[in-house]
Amino acid sequence: MEQSIRSIDGSRSLSNVGASLIDRESINQRALQLLQRNRRRRLLLNRSEDKARYIQPERSASSQQIHPPEHHISAHERITKARGTRYKPTDLALAEIRKYQRSTDLLISRMPFARLVKEVTDQFTTESEPLRWQSMAIMALQEASEAYLVGLLEHTNLLALHAKRITIMRKDMQLARRIRGQFI
């Protein structure tokens, strides 16, 4: 492309630049024409499966039976096709676990957590001297609390697996806190 713009002596010539612009414009025009022609063709295609839904079959006087269309698709098949593939709950759970293990985002919403922190601190302070929180302090507290909860749930899951179960129960959580040396 650079070669077509330069003239024989190496300097740029406007005639070559103008020619390349005209070539680009003609290519764009041709592409637009092809696109419009394809759109018109798609609109003109016969859609027999759509017509079969709305056009009533012809009834002859000799027979009152209506034959169903040969390519009949049940409503259930249509719905499942529209939805796409359905995954097993275990596959969905594993995909969700992988998603959250990859991310480093906080899982508890910021505003409800901040309200909870302020509510708890209001119980331990007097009304005359309310305690104020910086946003960074609340974020640090949220990071620490989420790390604590994740660790506790990991230990709880290990205890459930040790009991040959995959469902965590209250007794697993209590035992995990007791082993850690925390109150039940």
Swiss-Prot record:
**Compartments where located:** Nucleus; Chromosome, Centromere
Chain positions covered by the region annotation Disordered: 54-81
Q: What is the name listed in the Swiss-Prot or TrEMBL entry for this protein?
A: Histone H3-like centromeric protein CSE4
Subunit composition and interactions: Component of centromeric nucleosomes, where DNA is wrapped around a histone octamer core. The octamer contains two molecules each of H2A, H2B, CSE4/CENPA and H4 assembled in one CSE4-H4 heterotetramer and two H2A-H2B heterodimers. Interacts with the inner kinetochore.
List GO terms (cellular component aspect). CENP-A containing nucleosome; nucleus
Q: Where is the composition biased (Basic and acidic residues)?
A: 68-80
- Species: Kluyveromyces lactis (strain ATCC 8585 / CBS 2359 / DSM 70799 / NBRC 1267 / NRRL Y-1140 / WM37) (Yeast)
Give the highest taxon in the source lineage.
Answer: Eukaryota
Question: Which Gene3D superfamilies does this entry report, sorted A to Z?
Answer: Histone, subunit A (1.10.20.10)
* Any single Pfam family the record assigns to this protein: Histone
- Please give the function described in this protein's UniProt entry: Histone H3-like nucleosomal protein that is specifically found in centromeric nucleosomes. Replaces conventional H3 in the nucleosome core of centromeric chromatin that serves as an assembly site for the inner kinetochore. Required for recruitment and assembly of kinetochore proteins, mitotic progression and chromosome segregation. May serve as an epigenetic mark that propagates centromere identity through replication and cell division.
Q: Name one GO molecular function term.
A: protein heterodimerization activity
Where does this chain mainly localize?
A: nucleus
Question: Which keywords accompany this UniProt record?
Answer: Centromere, Chromosome, DNA-binding, Nucleosome core, Nucleus, Ubl conjugation
Residues of the region (H3-like) are 82-182
- PTM section of the record: Ubiquitinated. Is degraded through ubiquitin-mediated proteolysis when not protected by its association to the kinetochore.
